[in-house]
Regions:
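Membrane-spanning beta-strand positions in outer-membrane beta-barrel proteins
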Residues: 2, 10-12, 112, 124-128, ...
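Solvent-exposed loop/turn elements at secondary-structure boundaries
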Residues: 2-194, 306-326, 330
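Short sequence motifs at beta-strands and strand-loop junctions characteristic
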Residues: 101-107, 188, 196-201, 256-261, ...
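Membrane-embedded beta-strand positions of outer-membrane beta-barrel proteins
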Residues: 13-15, 115, 127, 209, ...
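Gram-negative outer-membrane beta-barrel transporters
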Residues: 128-290
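Hydrophobic, lipid-facing positions within transmembrane beta-strands of outer-membrane proteins
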Residues: 1, 109-113, 203-207, 262-268, ...
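C-terminal beta-signal and adjacent terminal beta-strands/loops
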Residues: 23, 122, 135-136, 140-143, ...
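Residue-level signature of outer-membrane beta-barrel architecture
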Residues: 1-5, 19, 117, 211, ...
Length: 398
């Protein structure tokens, strides 16, 4: 909906509202996920300690249970992560209530309210507020275990000046299943609302300025500030298994509310009269991504709080020492330039251009080492912005 506030075409208010559903494709519960072949266990993991140091697992890998063959020259292998592996038994069962009917697919609502104002002829500013919220989350409940079958424990972060607050803080919200129930899997997938409230909200404010000045000059620039807040603490209270990630690490952070992050973007383009040469450039300043401090805590250390070794003979528990959004990478600033000339020959038209990427030769860091070791290489750069380079191009129309 758009409304001309004063009827002079200079001030408008625009409101948009939409609901978007998760695609009903092959990767959803309406597709391959409910295929019987997708519901049985076709892969598992298990721990292995190379006791004899010959770089091969000297265990009976066909035996799904834990083995300690170190006294006979073999190795130590933990129990497989899913005892249903290679059996004609479903590990995943879907709630019939989410497979039939309407209004059940995961969705997100999106609302935007914008005000556009003409400041001068061919110069306008647009200010908008945007909110996006998600719903119909799915939860996985392992019916083979209860919440009381998980034992909570804590981990004390190492003291390190690179960590928020210098480290030394106690991280709670960690769980380990009763060892006698490890590997027993009977997952029931249903709506998360059956266990409690789960939320995910995005809020942002954007300001954009557009100027189309005479004689071929165009200027555009703007800023956007926003953040995503998520909370599934009520779900974790009922389903401690929700703290385990797909990679096997632990995620104790059920409420994540990072700071608002701001980015800036702009462009300018100008066509030089008579010589018909176009000069343009783009600039962007983007906040660095969220970083983790992934620490592998030995089972002996965990046992000090847990009261026993980790289930499944796991040698360590992996978790991030920092709350998502509390540690960010360096801001990435980049300037790109382009010069283009149009040549005309009879009925042919040739566009010759030179592009200069990363004109300021910024070495902004793009990825970091996120494995934490005290006095180690945590946050060492692993990838930086590509160095400044030029590209020559030509396009012929005839």
């Amino acid at each position: 909906v758009a409304y001309d506030v004063f009827g002079n075409g200079k001030t408008s208010v625009k409101v948009n509202l939409g609901k978007y559903l998760a695609a009903a494709d092959g990767s959803s519960i309406t597709g391959a996920l409910t295929n019987p072949l997708s519901r049985i266990s076709t892969s598992v993991t298990r721990t292995w300690t190379d006791t004899n140091k010959n770089f091969k697992p000297d265990c009976d890998l066909s035996n799904p249970l834990a083995q300690n063959l170190s006294t006979s020259g073999g190795d130590v292998c933990g129990q497989i992560s899913n005892l249903n592996f290679a059996k004609p038994v479903f590990s995943n069962t879907y709630d019939p209530a989410i497979l039939h009917g309407s209004g059940l697919r995961p969705y997100d609502w999106n609302i935007g309210v914008q005000v556009q104002q003409q400041l001068l002829p061919r110069v306008s500013v647009n200010v908008g507020y945007f909110r996006r919220w998600f719903g119909n989350f799915l939860a996985t409940d392992n019916l083979s275990v209860k919440a009381s079958d998980y034992t909570p424990f804590t981990v004390t972060a190492p003291a390190d000046p690179r960590l928020p607050g210098g480290g030394g803080n106690v991280i709670s919200g960690l769980y380990d299943v009763n060892p006698t129930l490890f590997g027993q899997t009977n997952n029931f997938i249903t709506l998360a609302d059956n266990y409690g409230s789960q939320t995910s909200h995005w809020n942002s404010v954007e300001v954009n300025l557009t100027a189309r000045v005479r004689q071929g000059l165009t200027l555009q620039g703007g800023t956007s500030t926003g953040r995503l807040t998520t909370d599934n603490c009520a779900i974790v209270a009922q389903l401690p298994e929700a703290t385990f990630t797909a990679t096997g690490s632990l995620n104790p952070y059920c409420h994540v509310e990072p700071p608002f992050l701001t980015q800036f973007k702009g462009l300018a383009a100008y066509t030089i009269p008579k010589v018909d040469v176009q000069v343009s450039g783009t600039m962007q300043s983007i906040p660095g991504g969220t970083l983790q401090a992934n620490l592998s805590v030995p089972t002996a250390t965990v046992a000090q709080s847990l009261g026993r070794p980790l289930a499944g003979s796991a040698p360590f528990a992996t978790l991030s020492l920092v709350t998502p959004g509390s540690v960010l990478g360096d801001r990435v600033n980049q300037l790109d330039l382009r010069v283009q000339k149009v040549l005309r020959f009879s009925r042919a038209r040739v566009q010759v251009g030179v592009d200069l990427y990363n004109a300021l030769n910024s070495s902004a860091i793009q990825t970091y080492n996120q494995t934490f070791i005290t006095n180690g290489n945590w946050l060492t750069p692993t990838l930086i912005l590509p160095a400044r380079f030029a590209k020559i191009s030509a396009q012929v129309d005839f």
